UniProtKB/Swiss-Prot annotation:
GO terms for molecular function: actin filament binding. Binds F-actin, but not G-actin. Interacts with the ARP2/3 complex. Interacts with APP1, ARK1, PRK1, SCP1, SRV2 and YIR003W via its SH3 domain. Interacts with the SH3 domain of RVS167 and with SLA1. The keyword Acetylation applies. This is Actin-binding protein. The gene is ABP1. Residues 427-446, 490-505 have a biased composition (Acidic residues). Residues 237-248, 270-279, 297-312, 332-341, 350-359, 398-414 have a biased composition (Basic and acidic residues). Changing residue 125 to A: In ABP1-4; no effect.
Length: 592
């Protein structure tokens, strides 16, 4: 048989209102409630009242009903809640079959918070005394509020022994009377002090008062969780700004003065400016260029692959090494002092355009560029080669050691042809006569080396007093090795030319870009055709030029007119397009 659930949700608001009156005790006239089904089988409040006896008499014999009452058990002032489920035998069968499930639903969902649950099927189960006893037992320990009656003890009289009288009268015996014990005096009554103060229990606690939940309902406990809503960015920014930046906090110095951040910024600017000035001075030759030590050579074994850590081109490194190598020979030369050139002025006037292009990566300011342009003269025209003006004297003086110590090494000028692509620097003011030759074409043709593409300034009309001031201009050096001596550069020259080269070897070499500028090259002369074939080579690998004066070629390209300017770097001309420049010797193989 299917269960038939009851409908108590339709009138749940009315039932809940009466239930709260009973539980809270807000209405003294309502202490019990009975709900019954109507014609639509919907449970609703049927009757209410205040007498527990009337509550037990109003259950109907033909309906399944549920009742709730608030009762004060005897001997206690604590009220308890009792719920009664009435299921008589005369009720419909289907309703009685579903009584247990429906009673549990009513007790758990509708009448919550009861103390005693009773199931009644006839009038015997609704006995008032039995129900009150159940409620009293459910209340737990009971503390009587009635004063216990004092038991009055009756004064016990000692038993009196009867005297024994024999038949024969003996001599009279005296009767001993019992010794009366003195009764103790009653204790004096302690006079009770009448204290009007209600706090006589020494607990100093306020008297408990019954709380009216309608007037002062219980407040729900507030959770400690605070939900995070929309973030106030302005508040967060203000808090962050209020914090002190630890980077700006300066520790007190020994003198107790605070460090100003603006002074630190100014110091950094000054340091960067001094660094740029030192780089300019090293380029102009006012400071001594750093020398290549053995440790640096060991650390930088392959500069072609690793790059130039000192940010200098191969030509500069080679020129520095040559200048250092020939510095001993240059000290023995005697040269008259130059009154027209003061010592504090720079020795050379390098090309301003090349200066700008060289230091473009250093982001030089416009002010510094203007100072450099004002300081140096404009460069000479490239269309016409500059001719070195002769010095005011014709014969060198005797070498003086004191003057040699005062004369800077950069006063010695080089004479020769620079390689293609190298920077040409003009020095017309400080290049008084080091050679007495006029750089005419006849002298160039007479001093031509056996290699066709190389123009060497010969000293045919040069005086015998100054053979050491001429030298063939060197080419770009290798990046990781020291070039071979000058005698190995032209092994095919005639014996007369070798003697002349040895005489010219004592002259100072071509300076680096950081020292005084070299003189401009002489006018190129048309090379004479030699019957002997010039060296040529075939490219074994592809090579891309890293600088303007280098040669770019691919595999199997033919390079002609090779000049062996160094062990690792050669100068040659590409056959297919006629371009000329330096190339690494390990990228090609010689054909003759």
């Amino acid at each position: 048989m299917a269960l038939e659930p009851i409908d108590y949700t339709t009138h749940s608001r009315e039932i809940d209102a009466e239930y709260l009156k009973i539980v809270r005790g807000s209405d003294p006239d309502t202490t019990w409630l009975i709900i019954s089904p109507n014609a639509k089988k919907e449970y609703e409040p049927e009757s209410t009242g205040s007498s527990f006896h009337d509550f037990l008499q109003l259950f109907d014999e033909t309906k399944v009903q549920y009742g709730l009452a608030r009762v004060s058990p005897p001997g206690s002032d604590v009220e308890k809640i009792i719920i009664i489920g009435w299921c008589p035998d005369s009720a419909p069968l289907k309703t009685r079959a579903s009584f247990a499930a429906n009673f549990a639903a009513v007790a758990n969902n509708l009448f919550k918070g009861y103390h005693v649950q009773v199931t009644a099927r006839d009038e015997d189960d609704l006995d008032e005394n039995e129900l009150l006893m159940k409620i009293s037992n459910a209340a737990g320990a009971r503390y009587s509020i009635q004063t216990s009656s004092k038991q009055q003890g009756k004064a016990s009289t000692p038993p009196v022994k009867k005297s024994f009288t024999p038949s024969k009268s003996p001599a009279p015996v005296s009767k001993k009377e019992p010794v009366k014990t003195p009764s103790p005096a009653p204790a004096a009554k302690i006079s009770s002090r009448v204290n009007d103060n209600n706090d006589d229990d020494d607990w100093n606690e306020p008297e408990l008062k019954e709380r009216d939940f309608d007037q002062a309902p219980l407040k729900p406990n507030q959770s400690s969780y605070k939900p995070i809503g929309k973030i106030d960015l302005q508040k967060v920014i203000a808090e962050e700004k209020a914090k002190e930046d630890p980077r700006l906090v300066q520790k007190p110095t020994a003198a107790g003065s605070k460090i100003d951040p603006s002074s630190d910024i100014a110091n950094l600017k000054n340091e960067s400016k001094l660094k740029r000035d030192s780089e300019f001075n090293s380029f102009l030759g006012t400071t001594k260029p750093p020398s290549m030590t053995e440790s640096s050579l060991k650390n930088d074994d392959d500069k072609v692959i690793k790059g130039f850590r000192n940010e200098k081109s191969p030509a500069q490194l080679w020129a520095e090494r040559k200048a250092k190598q020939n510095s001993g020979n240059a000290e023995t030369k005697a040269e008259a002092p130059k009154p027209e050139v003061p010592e504090d002025e720079p020795e050379g006037e390098p090309d301003v355009k090349d200066l700008k292009s060289k230091f473009e990566g250093l982001a030089a300011s416009e002010k510094e560029e203007e100072e450099m342009e004002n300081k140096f003269a404009p460069p000479p025209k490239k269309s016409e080669p500059t001719i070195i003006s002769p010095k005011p004297f014709s014969k060198p003086q005797e070498p003086v050691k004191a003057e040699e110590a005062e004369q800077p090494k950069t006063d010695y000028k080089k004479i020769g042809n620079p390689l293609p692509g190298m920077h040409i620097e003009a020095d017309n003011e400080e290049e008084p006569e080091e050679n007495d030759d006029d750089w005419d074409d006849d002298e160039d043709e007479a001093a031509q080396p056996p290699l066709p593409s190389r123009n060497v300034a010969s000293g045919a009309p040069v005086q015998k007093e100054e053979p050491e001031q001429e030298e063939i201009a060197p080419s770009l050096p290798s990046r990781n090795s020291i070039p071979a001596p000058k005698q190995e550069e032209a092994p095919e020259q005639a014996p007369e030319e070798e003697i002349e080269e040895e005489a010219e070897e004592a002259a100072p070499q071509l300076p680096s870009r950081s020292s005084a500028a070299p003189p401009p090259p002489p006018r190129r002369a048309t090379p004479e055709k030699k019957p002997k074939e010039n060296p040529w080579a075939t490219a074994e690998y592809d090579y891309d030029a890293a600088e303007d004066n280098e040669l770019t070629f691919v595999e199997n390209d033919k390079i002609i007119n090779i000049e062996f300017v160094d062990d690792d770097w050669w100068l040659g001309e590409l056959e297919k397009d006629g371009s000329k420049g330096l190339f690494p010797s390990n990228y090609v193989s010689l054909g003759n």
